[in-house]
């Protein structure tokens, strides 16, 4: 069978890198990295760097390929990073790709940079259908494939983890890149300093953490603050990866992106996966940062599935979303799907046996009042988290859940009745229901909207609205898992709450547009400010993540 040869060019930010690959091997790769004299990246200077070195990088690449017996005439296509990224850098690389494609008379392939990080990881590890934790300078996302697209389950609501680390490092007087310097100082720490831990469903926020860490430098050593920052931020991203595993039922985690080179982050993810019986995969460090090979290989997959673009369609997209791409190269039958299930076939477990092993807690049955079955939710320690972080959030979430679940019920939202509260354990009414992720329909989504409207009217934000946290028992819908709930009447808090649910619809369920429309109808029927909140949801969705 004839080999396919694709030349790929990466240039979204720091690295100008070009490579030639086939289905099975890397023929050659050449990289020139932009290194500013001081501070972070300057988009215009980075673009000037790429323009200065582009011709030389490609010339050297073609020379190395020729040494391996590959001529320019053997190339089948030119792939380039079309976005997301810094506009000036993207335009420079796209221009180089167009000129090369025109001169050789071969097609262009516009590659999504984020998806390229995923595909190089799958190519270079045994991963087949993973939950992907993608953490780079500008991007922090939890992603998994479903029905023709890579779906985003959660992401940063403000700044990418890598940029957050670099921002803190600059403020602390550390040279660029900040991540490796923080990792080195963290190894010399003597104690943990409490810092903000901000998770909203499967979304994250790092800006408050960075600010608090910078302020902590006034009273604590750089080593201790670096250690505390790293332990806190990494625990947050590992937790959202675990939440995605629990929600999807998948059994693999793939780490992608430049921040993934951090040894401590890898250790924490591996510990989490071992505890859940999942497999953890991470490619070699050379494939973690931005590189031409990932663009070339993803371009090859796209080329072989007929996914090329014309010169007119080769404009760059600095805000190119992962879930905007139609993934035409994956065979649907090989991917894991959320199983269909009915209340009649839903599992019924005997007392004492674990009913569910979620990201938050293990759940099992015990005898309750009047001989009825009761459900026990025990927030067990997470080995990947620092002990102080772990005990603090388990204790806080246990208290919060008991209090706000009762408050929600008083507001007319059906929730389980709490029987007993211990430090890390709740005993509550056992609802013989099914998580609606198995059977969600537009009429059911409308009922969800009605419940959330009542919740928001009472001033409560759930904090973890997913279809795993709603149970259908007969004709009645129950809202559960209030560990991340809080009182807040702001548009932003309510908007993020609904945004988390809409992300779940889009990432997990086939008919998500109909589900969103039905939810909006139900939400408007019980919440007077629904239109304002839904407008805020659109704003949140459109916020640039590449910053």
UniProtKB/Swiss-Prot annotation:
Residues annotated for ATP binding in this entry: 355-363, 377
Catalytic activity: L-seryl-[protein] + ATP = O-phospho-L-seryl-[protein] + ADP + H(+); L-threonyl-[protein] + ATP = O-phospho-L-threonyl-[protein] + ADP + H(+); L-threonylcarbamoyladenylate + adenosine(37) in tRNA = N(6)-L-threonylcarbamoyladenosine(37) in tRNA + AMP + H(+)
Database matches in PROSITE patterns: PROTEIN_KINASE_TYR
Keyword Nucleus part of the UniProt annotation: no
UniProt cofactor(s): Fe(2+)
Keyword line: Acyltransferase, ATP-binding, Cytoplasm, Iron, Kinase, Metal-binding, Multifunctional enzyme, Nucleotide-binding, Serine/threonine-protein kinase, Transferase, tRNA processing
Annotated binding of L-threonylcarbamoyladenylate, by residue: 134-138, 166, 179, 183, 262
Localization (cell): Cytoplasm
The keyword Metal-binding is assigned to this record: yes
InterPro entries according to UniProt: ATPase_NBD (IPR043129), Bud32 (IPR022495), Gcp-like_dom (IPR000905), KAE1/TsaD (IPR017861), Kae1_archaea_euk (IPR034680), Kinase-like_dom_sf (IPR011009), RIO_dom (IPR018934), tRNA_threonyl_synthase/kinase (IPR009220)
Cofactor detail note: Binds 1 Fe(2+) ion per subunit.
Major subcellular site: cytoplasm
Enzyme superclass (EC): transferase
A GO BP entry: tRNA threonylcarbamoyladenosine modification
Active-site positions on this chain: 464
HAMAP family xref list: Kae1, Kae1_Bud32_arch
Task performed by this protein: Required for the formation of a threonylcarbamoyl group on adenosine at position 37 (t(6)A37) in tRNAs that read codons beginning with adenine. Is a component of the KEOPS complex that is probably involved in the transfer of the threonylcarbamoyl moiety of threonylcarbamoyl-AMP (TC-AMP) to the N6 group of A37. The Kae1 domain likely plays a direct catalytic role in this reaction. The Bud32 domain probably displays kinase activity that regulates Kae1 function.
Assembly: Component of the KEOPS complex that consists of Kae1, Bud32, Cgi121 and Pcc1; the whole complex dimerizes.
Similarity comment text for this entry: In the N-terminal section; belongs to the KAE1 / TsaD family.
Record's protein name: Probable bifunctional tRNA threonylcarbamoyladenosine biosynthesis protein
Organism: Methanosarcina mazei (strain ATCC BAA-159 / DSM 3647 / Goe1 / Go1 / JCM 11833 / OCM 88)
